């Protein structure tokens, strides 16, 4: 039997240790959907979606309003039955199950919501205990389990507090503890941080990441915020009008998004050429201004030196930045290249096209870049 020590993952809450059994590793998908379609009238909320989620994975599902995210989650926990397709949870097909047969499946799935959904007349401990009481757990076991969960989420000193006495982040921690009460295999997080301030959002994401790492808990993370995906997801699926527009490891999708909807949603996190340079762009000039997207091995080396050595043109950094996602460097740089020698410039652009994720000539400026 394996055990794991779990900490709350935030400096604003007391870090604690709880011993909880970690599930055994398995290669079989814990969630699998095949050609799932759900219609509302003549509108397909999800339209032939197929996906699989590995045990212990954090899968981010992102899209604009109306993309089908919430419908997809409701299909996973059996609240919506698809019109066609199959859904397997831990190897069991659930679309044909009646409510009685679905009940034990749902106990394997925890839910965290945007608006907390806590009972205002019950304390934090009582809110967490409620699903255990409904499930028939003896009182002594409930008390022990609730204490463990409060410790896990860093709220041991808030057990007797009512929701009105808690901050937004503390309410969400109670919601997470309640979702984990029955020891689910999968946690569905539906916009769980969208009502929180940025600092509290980071503390909740750190808690989810820590729980995932230490317990092996599988998390399906529904959000419209790319920054949430960037911080904790292993893989991302982009939904658009009920279809999967793009999917892949988070760092690869962020480094070089292929679909227009992904590119649009990533704009808020992507550096832009400053206005002082945009206003100078012309069709001809002494310096070519390029946008270069880098990731992986190309971003780890002395990239500018490599360009200069290969083409005899020395790039000049104008603007941009690098980030690290899933341990991989990812970034967008704006560079200037001397444009007098068209042959050398063409060779440099060719080198960039080969070694960078994406290269775009934005225009030219006169004078030094």
Curated annotation (Swiss-Prot):
Coiled coil: none annotated. ATP binds at residues 63-70. It is found in: Cell inner membrane. Pfam families: ABC_tran (PF00005), NIL (PF09383). InterPro entries: AAA+_ATPase, ABC_transporter-like_ATP-bd, ABC_transporter-like_CS, ACT-like_dom_sf, MetN_ABC, MetN_ABC_transporter-like, NIL_domain, P-loop_NTPase. Keywords: Amino-acid transport, ATP-binding, Cell inner membrane, Cell membrane, Membrane, Nucleotide-binding, Translocase, Transport. It catalyses: L-methionine(out) + ATP + H2O = L-methionine(in) + ADP + phosphate + H(+); D-methionine(out) + ATP + H2O = D-methionine(in) + ADP + phosphate + H(+). GO terms for cellular component: plasma membrane. It is a peripheral membrane protein. Its EC number is 7.4.2.11. Gene3D superfamilies: 3.30.70.260, P-loop containing nucleotide triphosphate hydrolases. GO terms for molecular function: ABC-type D-methionine transporter activity; ATP binding; ATP hydrolysis activity. It is an enzyme of class 7 (translocase). Residues 31-266 form the ABC transporter domain. The complex is composed of two ATP-binding proteins (MetN), two transmembrane proteins (MetI) and a solute-binding protein (MetQ). PANTHER family: AMINO ACID IMPORT ATP-BINDING PROTEIN (PTHR43166), METHIONINE IMPORT ATP-BINDING PROTEIN METN (PTHR43166:SF30). Part of the ABC transporter complex MetNIQ involved in methionine import. Responsible for energy coupling to the transport system. Belongs to the ABC transporter superfamily. Methionine importer (TC 3.A.1.24) family. This is Methionine import ATP-binding protein MetN. It comes from Brucella abortus (strain 2308). The lineage of its organism: Bacteria, Pseudomonadati, Pseudomonadota, Alphaproteobacteria, Hyphomicrobiales.
């Amino acid at each position: 039997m394996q055990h794991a020590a779990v900490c709350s993952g935030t400096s604003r809450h007391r870090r604690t240790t709880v011993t909880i059994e970690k599930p055994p590793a398995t290669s079989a998908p814990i969630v699998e959907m095949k050609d799932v379609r759900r219609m509302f009238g003549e509108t397909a909320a999800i339209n032939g979606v197929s996906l699989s989620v590995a045990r212990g994975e954090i899968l981010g599902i992102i899209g604009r309003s109306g993309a089908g995210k919430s419908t997809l989650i409701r299909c996973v926990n059996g609240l919506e039955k698809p019109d066609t397709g199959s859904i397997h949870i831990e190897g069991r097909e659930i679309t044909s199950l009646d409510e009685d047969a679905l009940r034990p499946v749902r106990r394997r799935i925890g839910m965290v919501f945007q608006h907390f959904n806590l009972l205002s007349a019950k304390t934090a401990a009582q809110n967490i205990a409620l699903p255990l009481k409904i499930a028939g757990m003896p009182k002594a076991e409930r008390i022990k389990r609730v204490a463990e969960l409060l410790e896990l989420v860093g709220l041991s000193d808030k057990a007797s507090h009512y929701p009105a006495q808690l901050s937004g982040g503390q309410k969400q921690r109670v919601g997470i503890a309640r979702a984990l009460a029955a020891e689910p295999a999968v946690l569905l997080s539906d916009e769980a941080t969208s009502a929180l301030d940025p600092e509290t959002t980071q503390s909740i994401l750190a808690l989810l990441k820590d729980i995932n790492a230490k317990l092996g808990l599988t998390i399906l993370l529904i959000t419209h915020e790319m920054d949430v995906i960037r911080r904790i997801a292993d893989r991302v699926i982009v939904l658009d009008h009920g279809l999967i527009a793009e999917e892949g490891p988070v760092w690869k999708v962020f480094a070089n998004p292929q679909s227009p909807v992904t590119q649009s949603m990533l704009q808020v996190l992507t550096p832009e050429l400053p206005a002082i340079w945009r206003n100078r762009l012309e069709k001809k000039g002494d310096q070519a201004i390029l946008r270069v997207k880098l990731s992986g091995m190309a971003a780890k080396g002395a990239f500018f030196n490599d360009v200069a050595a290969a083409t005899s043109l020395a790039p000049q950094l104008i603007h941009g930045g690098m980030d690290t996602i899933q341990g991989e460097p990812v970034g967008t740089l704006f560079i200037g290249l001397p444009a007098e020698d068209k042959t050398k410039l063409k060779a440099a652009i060719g080198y960039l096209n080969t070694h960078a994720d994406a290269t775009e000539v934005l225009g030219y400026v006169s004078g030094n870049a």
